């Protein structure tokens, strides 16, 4: 059988037949088939059947379960100028970023929905095209449209979450949320005694380390919260103190081994009357090795309240003047009144000093030495304290108030008078309290003879270390009272410094008063009593210009004998019984 030779007409006719067959295939009714595996998720619409055409000419129909599908009318086939693809095809998106297939068209990025398996089981699947071929793949999680790096991060988070679910609960899940006690922001930790945020912690640290003279522009009642905490520094600092912030604040539930050891040592120290130098060093007190065999004062076992109470009970009684208000004051009469008052107050001052806690534990030599160095300073600070309630006047006694004009009758007294009135004004401005006054007076007694410079005839102290220990105890009591009064830490430090600075002015006034009193003695203006005269001789100031005069006076005056370092006029105030008791305790 011979085949006819193909010609151009026959080829064209054959091509038309193929195209007609393809068009017939496209227009035939869709054939429903069952797949071995269900297809994946597709974006469907209006709960209709979605028709998908394949190059083989077979059409598959998938019914969506209560999910919208594309209608057949919405799908179109655009003729391609190239085989299996054209640049004119739009709206086609594949999952593996390959050239789009000319068969499947989607209007926008699909959000896949699960199809119903032919057995009724709902399993997600999706279609994948590879160079014109199609395969049914198992659908990935809804985030499979992300990039590969996002997929890796997502899978890593899923593995971490699954591991956390299997393991014990994490610290973040069990950590209790704390809020700042000042501004109610999230607290970063326990700072300065309260739960606070980093901002309030840093603000309080700056305030206690530097200057905090903040002024509120309003009424000191500004609202301090997370948003308005920076609006008013004064009110913010006030609230920090109100909620309990303090320097060195620690959590009470954090008690490490070091704190427990310190507490145990403190309890052992309170049970013992004998304190060794190592325990004194823990209290920040340096002790000489020569103190090892010394029995220290029981004042160390006293609390601040007990020490204040003992000092209040030791206060001397009120001394009245013999002044007759009907008679005018002259230089001689005024000096007689003042020296008489001073002599009687000296007796009470010695009794007061012996009742100061720890003073009688010193040697007799040191007791006399301290009294001879501090007697005029103690009398002057008592005069200043009595004059606080009388502005512009000095209250030498309840019945003897003198102003500046009355002090002019005595030569050289006006300068000392003005300094005393100025110091009384300073006490009044500071609103000095009685507890602070008695502590200051005790500090003057114990501190005056530590650095002797008024007389070259006085010997050095014997129990300097013990004097420092008692002095530190009284200073600690003063600080404790300031803290108890409600002052902030910076206010306590400032007030303590101001009070201690006043002591130097009192020392200066004492030196001026000693010079004036000694000049009155040399002029024989007024007779001095034995006790006052002895105290004055102990404070004679030696200068180059009057050194020869002083030596002549010393040669004319008979030598004074002392017993155990006590001056003759002070010996009646230290009986033999007291001397024996003092020596037994040292």
UniProtKB/Swiss-Prot annotation:
Keywords, alphabetical: DNA-binding, Lipid-binding, Metal-binding, Nucleus, Receptor, Steroid-binding, Transcription, Transcription regulation, Zinc, Zinc-finger
Classification via SMART domains: HOLI (SM00430), ZnF_C4 (SM00399)
SUPFAM superfamilies: Glucocorticoid receptor-like (DNA-binding domain) (SSF57716), Nuclear receptor ligand-binding domain (SSF48508)
Origin superkingdom: Eukaryota
UniProt subcellular location: Nucleus
One GO BP annotation of this record: left/right axis specification
Segments forming domain NR LBD: 303-539
Zinc finger (NR C4-type): 180-200, 216-240
Biased composition, class Basic and acidic residues, residue ranges: 149-160, 265-276, 543-556
Biased composition range(s): Basic residues: 252-264
Region listing for Disordered, in residue ranges: 144-173, 252-276, 543-569
GO CC terms in record: chromatin; cytoplasm; nucleus
Gene Ontology MF, one: estrogen response element binding
InterPro entries registered for this protein in UniProt: Est_rcpt/est-rel_rcp, Estr_rcpt, Estr_rcpt_N, NHR-like_dom_sf, Nucl_hrmn_rcpt_lig-bd, Nuclear_hormone_rcpt_NR3, Nuclear_hrmn_rcpt, Znf_hrmn_rcpt
Subunit structure as annotated in this protein's UniProt entry: Binds DNA as a homodimer. Can form a heterodimer with ER-beta.
Similarity annotation: Belongs to the nuclear hormone receptor family. NR3 subfamily.
Name used for this protein in its record: Estrogen receptor
Natural source organism: Xenopus laevis (African clawed frog)
């Amino acid at each position: 059988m011979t085949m006819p030779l193909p010609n151009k007409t026959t080829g064209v006719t054959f091509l038309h037949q193929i195209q007609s067959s393809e068009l017939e295939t496209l227009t035939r009714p869709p054939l429903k088939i069952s797949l071995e595996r269900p297809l994946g998720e597709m974006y469907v619409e209006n709960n209709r059947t979605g028709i998908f055409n394949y190059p083989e000419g077979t059409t598959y129909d998938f019914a969506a379960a209560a999910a919208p599908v594309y209608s057949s009318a919405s799908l179109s086939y655009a003729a391609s100028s190239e085989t299996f693809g054209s640049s004119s095809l739009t709206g086609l998106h594949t999952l593996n970023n390959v050239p789009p297939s000319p068969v499947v068209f989607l209007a926008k990025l699909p959000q896949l929905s699960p199809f119903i398996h032919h057995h009724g089981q709902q399993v997600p699947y999706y279609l994948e095209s590879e160079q014109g071929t199609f395969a049914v793949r198992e659908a990935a999680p809804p985030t499979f449209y992300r990039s590969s790096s996002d997929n890796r991060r997502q899978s890593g988070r899923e593995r971490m979450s699954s591991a956390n679910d299997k393991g014990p609960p994490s610290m973040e899940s069990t950590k209790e949320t704390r809020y700042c006690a000042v501004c109610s922001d999230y607290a970063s930790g326990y700072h300065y005694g309260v739960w606070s945020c980093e901002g309030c912690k840093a603000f309080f640290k700056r305030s206690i380390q530097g200057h905090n003279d903040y002024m509120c522009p309003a009424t000191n009642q500004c609202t301090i919260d997370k948003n308005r905490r920076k609006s008013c520094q004064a009110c913010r600092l006030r609230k920090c103190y109100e909620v309990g912030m303090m320097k060195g604040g620690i959590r009470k539930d954090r008690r490490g081994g070091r704190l427990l050891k310190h507490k145990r040592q403190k309890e052992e120290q309170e049970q013992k009357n004998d304190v060794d130098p190592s325990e004194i060093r823990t209290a920040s007190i340096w002790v000489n090795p020569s103190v090892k065999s010394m029995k220290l004062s029981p004042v160390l076992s006293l609390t601040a309240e007990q020490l204040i109470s003992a000092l209040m009970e030791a206060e001397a009684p009120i001394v009245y003047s013999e002044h007759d208000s009907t008679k005018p004051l002259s230089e001689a009469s005024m000096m007689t009144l003042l020296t008489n008052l001073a002599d009687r107050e000296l007796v009470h001052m010695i009794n007061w000093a012996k009742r100061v806690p720890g003073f009688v534990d010193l040697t007799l030599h040191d007791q006399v030495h301290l009294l001879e160095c501090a007697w005029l300073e103690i009398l002057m600070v008592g005069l200043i304290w009595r004059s606080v309630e009388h502005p512009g006047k000095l209250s030498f006694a309840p019945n003897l108030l003198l102003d500046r004009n009355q002090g002019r009758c005595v030569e050289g007294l006006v300068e000392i008078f003005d300094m005393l009135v100025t110091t009384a004004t300073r006490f009044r401005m500071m609103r000095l309290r009685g507890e602070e006054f008695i502590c200051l007076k005790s500090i003057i007694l114990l501190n005056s003879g530590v650095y002797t410079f008024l007389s070259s005839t006085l010997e050095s102290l014997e129990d300097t270390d013990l004097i420092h220990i008692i002095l530190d105890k009284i200073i600690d009591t003063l600080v404790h009272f300031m803290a108890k009064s409600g002052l902030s830490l910076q206010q306590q430090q400032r007030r303590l410094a101001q009070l201690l600075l006043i002591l130097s002015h009192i020392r200066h006034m004492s030196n001026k008063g000693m010079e004036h009193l000694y000049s009155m003695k040399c002029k024989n203006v007024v007779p001095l009593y034995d006790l006052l005269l002895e105290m004055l001789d102990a404070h004679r100031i030696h200068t180059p210009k009057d050194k020869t005069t002083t030596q002549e006076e010393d040669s004319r005056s008979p030598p004074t004998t002392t017993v155990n370092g006590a001056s003759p006029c002070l010996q009646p105030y230290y009986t033999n019984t007291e001397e024996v008791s003092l020596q037994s305790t040292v």
